[in-house]
């Protein structure tokens, strides 16, 4: 179905009004207005404010065709971030595709906490496990410019995405490693081990929304077990590789998951274990000191 027809000219204003008034085509339960604004910004290469400053701007046939293609993909539940190949994280835009997990706002707390834990360290060494798009490692390299940041991913495609983002921001203090860090990590003097590991239990994975389960990489979401296996491996790794006084900083799931993870680090004799809330008031980050 071609929503825009073949002949009529469509302005930004008319397109947005069409979305607001066409509940038959656009599901009322979806926030299509925001999606369309993002699509238009991507196609027209402009900011959201520019859309409303140039409300009468008319899209050409190629732009309308691209917009319709984006809408069709979104109606099949594909995430907006994959469609426009862009996601915001800590005030910066990152390239994303289906090879990497889409950055979430709650993950930004990892950055805040790491900056606090390293503020008195000179040239801290930070390792990001499972870097994906590189949003964590690149942001830390920029925000803590004297840090030496290392980041790994077992997926070469993910490393390619991270490298693309790294080059976009001309980051020089970051080394990307395409290896399994649990099998081979040469550095033995880390100040920070940081990660947003796969923490969704396998039985809960199949209950996720279609835009997640059908598009985002499964390996970034679940450990195919009880959601705790990576935390045990990271706890073991930290005992071996962290400096005395070094920190592990990890995202955790909701519900009982933070308490289950805290018990793991208790069992591995970590000190100063603490849970931190995200911007919604949920415990979503755990820190533990070696």
What are these regions (language model features)?
Residues 9, 60-64, 101-105, 224-228, ...:
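Short, solvent-exposed loop/helix junctions and linker helices
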Residues 2-87:
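N-terminal auxiliary segments of SAM/dcSAM-dependent transferases
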Residues 16, 36-37, 67, 77-80, ...:
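A general structural signal for well-ordered alpha-helical segments in protein cores
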Residues 146-148, 152-290:
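S-adenosylmethionine
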Residues 1-28, 62, 116-123, 148, ...:
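Short, Lys/Arg-enriched, disordered terminal segments
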Residues 55-57, 65-144, 149-164, 287:
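SAM-dependent Rossmann-like transferase core, predominantly class I methyltransferases
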Residues 37-41, 69-72, 112, 138, ...:
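Generic alpha-helical structural context detector
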């Amino acid at each position: 179905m071609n929503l825009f027809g073949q002949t009529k000219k469509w302005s930004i204003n008319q397109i947005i009004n069409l979305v607001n008034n066409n509940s038959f085509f656009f599901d009322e339960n979806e926030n299509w207005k925001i999606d369309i604004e993002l699509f238009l910004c991507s196609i027209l290469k402009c900011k959201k404010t520019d859309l409303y400053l140039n409300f009468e701007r008319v899209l050409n046939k190629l732009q309308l065709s691209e917009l319709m293609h984006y809408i069709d993909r979104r109606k099949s539940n594909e995430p907006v971030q994959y469609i426009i190949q862009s996601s915001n994280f800590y005030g910066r835009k990152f390239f994303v595709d289906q090879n990497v997990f889409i950055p979430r706002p709650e993950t930004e707390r990892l950055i805040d906490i790491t900056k606090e834990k390293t503020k008195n360290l000179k040239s801290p060494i930070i390792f990001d496990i499972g870097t994906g798009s590189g949003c964590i490692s690149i942001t830390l390299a920029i925000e803590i410019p004297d840090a030496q940041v290392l980041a790994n991913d077992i997926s070469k495609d993910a490393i390619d995405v991270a490298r693309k983002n790294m080059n976009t921001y001309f980051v020089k203090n970051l080394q990307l490693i395409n290896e399994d860090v649990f099998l081979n990590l040469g550095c033995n003097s880390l100040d920070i081990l940081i990660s947003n590991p796969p923490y969704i239990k396998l039985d809960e994975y199949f209950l996720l929304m279609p835009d997640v389960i059908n598009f985002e990489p499964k390996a970034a979401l679940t450990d195919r077990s009880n959601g705790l296996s990576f935390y045990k491996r990271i706890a073991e790794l930290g005992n071996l590789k962290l400096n005395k006084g070094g920190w592990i900083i990890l995202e955790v799931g909701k519900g009982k998951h933070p308490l289950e993870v805290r018990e793991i680090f208790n069992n591995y004799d970590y000190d100063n274990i603490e849970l931190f809330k995200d911007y919604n008031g949920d415990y979503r980050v755990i820190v533990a000191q070696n």
